[in-house]
């Protein structure tokens, strides 16, 4: 089974959502990407359709935007 990818920016809202996602779907089923520290993954997230973080991209390619922490434009600086 392919993993979901959870993108976030490292803020407290995002880290809280990360813990909830891991609890809900299991650590083995999700790859966590902190865009704040892995800036080289911004283009990947945008290509997947992520407009803001935190967001979960499902194995089927659906983007679930969770709450609102920061826009991708904000993360680019």
Predicted regions and their residues:
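Glycine-/small-residue-rich active-site loops that bind phosphorylated ligands and cofactors
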Residues: 12-13, 37, 63
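Structural micro-motif
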Residues: 46-57
């Amino acid at each position: 089974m392919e993993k979901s990818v959870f993108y976030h920016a490292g803020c407290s809202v995002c880290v809280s959502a990360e813990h909830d996602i891991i609890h809900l779907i299991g650590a083995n089923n999700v790859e966590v990407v902190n865009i704040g520290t892995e800036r080289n993954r911004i283009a990947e997230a945008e290509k997947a359709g992520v407009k803001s973080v935190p967001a979960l991209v499902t194995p089927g390619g659906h983007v679930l935007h969770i709450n609102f922490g920061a826009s991708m434009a904000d993360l680019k600086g």
